[in-house]
Each structure stands twice: as structure tokens, then as C-alpha cells.
């Protein structure tokens, strides 16, 4: 029994690390596709519908008994909002931001999610904050560090890219050249992470009423794909392939299936791990994708990073772990308090003064 549990623990750790490496490779491939001029919304549409086709049979086999007989109107509204924020808004802005920056920057930004989720949940009244509690203060400090690190990394990364591309222009020491396109890309990424964080908070509310994460992902992906198609028609009036002919429709469909497998499989595995071990351990592995992307970009794309970029990245990772550490400690403290309250309630019931003592 102990050996089986050890193997499961090792499988979880190896699976989480492997998922981040695959995610990093997928991000690098995405960056290459975007550099060819392929429309980001087209990639979102193809990958989303591919995910629906691949994940729906799995949801039917594993979670059919968990489906409710009917969905309430409130639950339907939440599902639509998650589809808009987590699929159309997040993926569209994320790919647009990656197009203007790099895969390394795009994989670094999602590390802001725990801090943003904390702020959104606090504003919505779902997260308790006591200024007298040390863990609450650590979470607030970690959130500030995350945001500061993201801003520093964005500014330094945009400056580095510009200076390395204008070697013939003499650089004045007191003047800093900033690539406005990179700054715009970072803003797209920040907005994308805000959308993702909002959708995660909503998902927690949905799963309390609809405890089938794979089925929820399938439904949200379908609705998100439909809304993205509607957005494509609203913005461009048609489903134009753009520069997709450069690589061929067959290769693009093949990537869509690969992207659907990566996103659908990764999210399903994360949902299983969260159910067994909680969300904290999943978040702890998220910086691996950023590190892999930085290394791959440095060797394959000759992308330069200065000390300021790494300092901002380190600051953001530090803030992330502060938030996760405080959240984990706070959850443990709440569990201990609940156990203590249960024990006190049991004692009061057992030694009720209105009951005669046993002789």
C-alpha cells in the first residue's frame, strides 16, 4: 500500500513537471506560428473545437453520473461568463500578446494568476483577509511583489529587444529606448491574465454546484469556440485564413489537434491532481515552463535577456511562492480550527450539564 502511494506521488510530481515542459514547447511552437502571420483568433477557434472533440468522450465516460438533470439559469450565466473570460478573452489576448512579445514572456505572465485570483476573490468576498493575521499580510505583500516583478520584467524585456535590434544607432547613456510594440504586448498579456483569473474564480463557484471538471471544460470550450467565431466575424466579417496558406491547411489542422491534446489533457490532469492534492501543488510547478522557454529561446531564437529581466522574473516568482506559502498555511490553520471546534462541540455534547452524569 505504501509503495503504491509512493508511486502515485512520484507520478504526480513527474506528470506536473512534464506537463510544464510540454506546455513550454507548445508555447514556442505557437510563437513560431504567430510569427508567420497566422491570425491568433483562427488558432483559438481550431484548438478549442479540437479540444471539445477530444475531451467530450472522456467526460461522458468518467463523469456521466455526476451530471445534474438540469442546469439552473444562474449556472448557465456563469458558464457563459467563463467561456467569454477563460476562452475568448484569455486565449485571444494571450496569443496577441505573445505575437508582440515572445513565448518566454507569455509563459511568465500566468505566474501572476495566484496573486490576481487572491485580489479578485477578496473583492468578491470569497477570500477572507485579516490585517491582524500574518498570513494575510504575507499574501498581500506577495501580490505586490508579483505585480512589481511583472512590470519590471515587461519594461526591461522591451528595452533589451529594442537595444539589441538597433546596433548601428549610437546609444545615449541618459536616454532609454523602449519598444512600444513590446509594451503593448505586455498589456495584452496582463489583460489576458485578468480574464483567466476571473474565470478561475468563477470555476470554483461552478464546481460547487456542478462537480464535473472535465465536463465543465468541454462545455466551456464549446461555448468559447462559438463566441470566438462570432468575434472573428464581428471584427473581420469572414473566416479568413490569413497567412495560414504559408504552412498549409493540413499542417494547421494537425497543430490544432496537437494543441487540443495539450490543453485538454493538461487541464484534465491538473483537475485530477487538484482533486487529490489541492491547487497549491499545481501552481508550484508553473515557473518550470518559463525557465524552459527562456533556455530554448536563448539557444534556438537567440533571444537576449538582460539582468533586469531576470530580476523581474525572480521577483515575480518570489511573490508567487509567498502567496502560495501563506495560502497553504492559512488553509492548514483553518482545518485545525475546525477540528478544535468539532472537539469542543463533542465535549459540550458529552458533558452537557442538563444530562445526569453516569455513575
UniProtKB/Swiss-Prot annotation:
It is found in: Membrane. One of its GO terms (cellular component) is membrane. The chain crosses the membrane at residues 5-25, 41-61, 77-97, 105-125, 143-163, 183-203, 206-226, 246-266, 279-299, 305-325. Keywords: Membrane, Repeat, Transmembrane, Transmembrane helix. Residues 30-154, 206-324 form the EamA domain. Pfam families: EamA. GO terms for molecular function: transmembrane transporter activity. It is a multi-pass membrane protein. InterPro entries: EamA_dom, WAT1-related. Belongs to the drug/metabolite transporter (DMT) superfamily. Plant drug/metabolite exporter (P-DME) (TC 2.A.7.4) family. This is WAT1-related protein At4g16620. It comes from Arabidopsis thaliana (Mouse-ear cress). The lineage of its organism: Eukaryota, Viridiplantae, Streptophyta, Embryophyta, Tracheophyta.
Amino acid at each position: 500500500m505504501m509503495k503504491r502511494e509512493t508511486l502515485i506521488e512520484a507520478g504526480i510530481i513527474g506528470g506536473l513537471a512534464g506537463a510544464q515542459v510540454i506546455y513550454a514547447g507548445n508555447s514556442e511552437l505557437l510563437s513560431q506560428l504567430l510569427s508567420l502571420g497566422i491570425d491568433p483568433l483562427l488558432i483559438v477557434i481550431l484548438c478549442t473545437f479540437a479540444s471539445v472533440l477530444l475531451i467530450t468522450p472522456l467526460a461522458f465516460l468518467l463523469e456521466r453520473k455526476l451530471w445534474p438533470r438540469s442546469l439552473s439559469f444562474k449556472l448557465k450565466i456563469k458558464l457563459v461568463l467563463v467561456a467569454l473570460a477563460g476562452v475568448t478573452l484569455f486565449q485571444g489576448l494571450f496569443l496577441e500578446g505573445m505575437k508582440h512579445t515572445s513565448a518566454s514572456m507569455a509563459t511568465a505572465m500566468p505566474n501572476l494568476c495566484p496573486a490576481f485570483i487572491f485580489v479578485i476573490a477578496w473583492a468578491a468576498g470569497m477570500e477572507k483577509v485579516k490585517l491582524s493575521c500574518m498570513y494575510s499580510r504575507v499574501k498581500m505583500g506577495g501580490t505586490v511583489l508579483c505585480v512589481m516583478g511583472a512590470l519590471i520584467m515587461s519594461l526591461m524585456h522591451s528595452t533589451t529587444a529594442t537595444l539589441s535590434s538597433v546596433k548601428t544607432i549610437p546609444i545615449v547613456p541618459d536616454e532609454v529606448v523602449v519598444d512600444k510594440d513590446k509594451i503593448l504586448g505586455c498589456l495584452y498579456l496582463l489583460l489576458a491574465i485578468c480574464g483567466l483569473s476571473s474565470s478561475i474564480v468563477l470555476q470554483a463557484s461552478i464546481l460547487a454546484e456542478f462537480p464535473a471538471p472535465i465536463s465543465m471544460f468541454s462545455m466551456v470550450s464549446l461555448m468559447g469556440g462559438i463566441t470566438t467565431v462570432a468575434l472573428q466575424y464581428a471584427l473581420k466579417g469572414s473566416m479568413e485564413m490569413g497567412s495560414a496558406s504559408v504552412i498549409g491547411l493540413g499542417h494547421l489542422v494537425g497543430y490544432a489537434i496537437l494543441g487540443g491534446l495539450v490543453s485538454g489533457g493538461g487541464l484534465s490532469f491538473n483537475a485530477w491532481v487538484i482533486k487529490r492534492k489541492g491547487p497549491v501543488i499545481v501552481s508550484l510547478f508553473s515557473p518550470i515552463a518559463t525557465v524552459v522557454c527562456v533556455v530554448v529561446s536563448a539557444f534556438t531564437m537567440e533571444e537576449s535577456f538582460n539582468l533586469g529581466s531576470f530580476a523581474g522574473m525572480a521577483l515575480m516568482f518570489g511573490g508567487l511562492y509567498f502567496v502560495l506559502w501563506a495560502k497553504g498555511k492559512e488553509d492548514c490553520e483553518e482545518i485545525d480550527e475546525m477540528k478544535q471546534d468539532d472537539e469542543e462541540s463533542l465535549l459540550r455534547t458529552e458533558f452537557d450539564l442538563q444530562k445526569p452524569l453516569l455513575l
